[in-house]
Amino acid sequence: MNSTQMMQWGGMPCVRLNAGGYTALIAPDLGSNVIRLRDEERGVEFFRFKNSNTYEELIQSAEVWGLPTLYLPNRFADGILKTSDAVYHLPVNEKAPYNNHIHGFLHKRPHTVVE
């Protein structure tokens, strides 16, 4: 049965999703980090998960626990992103001497859940 539930986990508000035999636990206050993704039928955890984790542990080691949204921040030299079929010119938001376009901040921003 599919379901959505607002709950507290590790001292923070979370959204628990159940669908198709899978459970996901998402922390909106941590940039919608998918803290847990589990195949309930097989008992398989897709990400490292510890039920006793705290909010502080998750913030200090976001790269270890779960799957942060649009993780990792990075930079493009001179604001230029080249792909196989195009060249994109992004605004330079890290000025001289570096002249980069820096991206990746959503994983550090709280998100709002709307029903």
Feature-to-residue mapping (PLM):
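Surface-exposed acidic/polar loop and edge beta-strand patches at domain peripheries
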Residues: 1-115
